[in-house]
From Swiss-Prot:
Disrupted gene: phenotype observed: Cells lacking this gene are unable to grow on polygalacturonate (PGA) or digalacturonate, but can grow on galacturonate.
Swiss-Prot/TrEMBL induction comment: Induced by galacturonate and at a higher level by polygalacturonate. Is expressed under the control of KdgR, but is not controlled by PecS. Is repressed by glucose.
Pfam families: KduI
Keywords recorded for this protein, A-Z: Isomerase, Metal-binding, Zinc
GO biological process: D-galacturonate catabolic process; D-glucuronate catabolic process; pectin catabolic process
Residue positions binding Zn(2+): 196, 198, 203, 245
Full protein name: 4-deoxy-L-threo-5-hexosulose-uronate ketol-isomerase
Organism: Dickeya dadantii (strain 3937) (Erwinia chrysanthemi (strain 3937))
Coiled-coil region: none
Length: 278
């Protein structure tokens, strides 16, 4: 498990390219028949990927000492979205069939969590976020239809995109975790511009659905001290609450957003005008 410490905005603005990437970019998410984990001190979120190919993959079997618990979800909840082939998630013996672009929420207290693929030639690829939890809510599958797809933006500003809200209060209860998937329309390049911050929550963006020659310039930093990180396929960026989080790609792309913090109000944003950015 990799560990990323919190960082003050005054420190972040002094970093060079290598420093920004070291602190905020998660370059590697998926390994065959393995579970990856990056633990951020910012709101204690854990980010990673599970890609079962030839065998079932369990989550968090060896992190008890690092988290100070006897099992992974003893004091945590978890959300996962499948961006690969059909998969199955077993939670304490109960099986959930999770197809492409379907999701699962697993509540606090689940002990035995196993991920498998239906077809090893087309393995499932589960991207997950986990956050501290104070109580238990039921484990549940979320379909793409339940995510209530909403298309916003337009071609003139190159930001027409469809937002899918999988793990939000309107769909199911969680302690603090929210997750969703945003898909840009063909020929559109910008996400979240005009941009915003939200002092009450942190966020992680996971970029995917990109070919080898496609890249996203992820914008970050305080509105008057912006920086960028160049992101490639299946990489994630940690966004502290003081940072904007926006991006422009060389071609269209898709990304998963996950938030934890004080509240779960999707519209609770501190908007920043483009004219105010520096």
């Amino acid at each position: 498990m990799q560990v990323r410490q919190s960082i003050h905005s005054d420190h972040a603005r002094q970093l060079d390219t290598a420093g920004l990437r070291r602190e905020f970019l998660i370059e590697h998410i998926f390994d065959a028949d393995a579970c990856t984990m990056t633990y951020s001190h910012i709101d204690r979120i854990i980010v990673g990927g599970v890609m079962p190919v030839h065998q079932a993959v369990t989550v968090g079997e060896d992190v008890g000492k690092q988290l100070g618990v006897s099992y992974f979800l003893e004091r945590r909840e978890l959300g996962a979205i499948n961006i690969g082939g059909a998969g199955v998630v077993s939670v304490d013996g109960e099986r959930y069939a999770i197809g492409h672009e379907e999701a699962i929420y697993i509540g606090k207290g689940a002990r035995d969590i196993r991920f498998t693929s239906v077809d090893p030639a087309k393995p499932a690829r589960f991207y997950y976020n986990s956050a501290p939890a104070h109580t238990t809510f039921p484990t549940r599958k979320i379909t793409a239809a339940e995510a209530s797809p909403q298309t916003i933006g337009d071609d003139a500003t190159s930001n027409r995109r469809t937002i899918n809200k999988y793990i939000v209060p309107d769909v199911l209860p969680t302690c603090q975790l929210t997750m969703g998937l945003t898909k840009l329309a063909e020929g559109n390049l910008w996400n979240t511009m005009p941009c915003h911050t939200h002092e009450r929550r942190m966020e992680v963006y996971f970029y995917f659905d990109m070919d080898e020659e496609t890249a996203v310039f992820h914008m970050m930093g305080q509105p008057q001290e912006t920086r960028h990180i160049l992101v490639h396929n299946e990489q994630a960026v940690i966004s502290p609450s003081w940072s904007i989080h926006s991006g422009v790609g060389t071609k269209r792309y898709t990304f998963i957003w996950g938030m934890v913090g004080e509240n779960q109000v999707f519209s609770d944003m501190d908007h920043v005008k483009v004219s105010e950015l520096r």
